[in-house]
């Protein structure tokens, strides 16, 4: 959901503005552990990278460790094609959850970022001495309905599920619509209680892994990006809070994180 589009250029300029500013002294209010930053390359699969990064960090914080393959999601998307023929890889983060529930998941080590088309899609997953089908493995790392999909649309009824009217929502997924202040409170509470949150805008998606502030007390959200490590901050983005909330169209967190008081 990034390369080869005007939207990508807008998002790229936005993120350059966020992350290429003169160096600042950031104070981390919270920074969650994470798997290594991946690189989506020329694909438009940022929605898959962001959602899987969220699941990975959630598992690390449970004392588990998984490293999942966005390339597998991209291959399964070919069986579940988008009506967008010009940009067939674009979708929402909810699509990653839907594809996992339907087609399963494999580990990053067997289908990494640089996997060529000649590298076959594995039929089995071997993990800690156990053998799983991709579907069994997916359900072990992300149970169906484990995550809540949230949005804020003032023109629609709150606390009802609504269809977010963006082209990437070609699956017609319905998200829980809540007030912006409530969405902010749930997000900050989740992070402070050590739960990652998946963030999505109209042009990009990333995993929120922390919060920070600078010497002027300006607040930032620390985002795990999917453009490789040859970037400022090793592939992390320090996005000012006002920009993050201005651009958000959807957030995803576990039901456990959402229910925190």
PLM-predicted stretches and their roles:
Residues 21, 35, 125-261:
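Active-site signature of cysteine proteases
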Residues 1-7:
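Bacterial N-terminal signal peptides that target proteins for export
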Residues 41-55, 86-98, 204:
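Active-site nucleophilic cysteine motif
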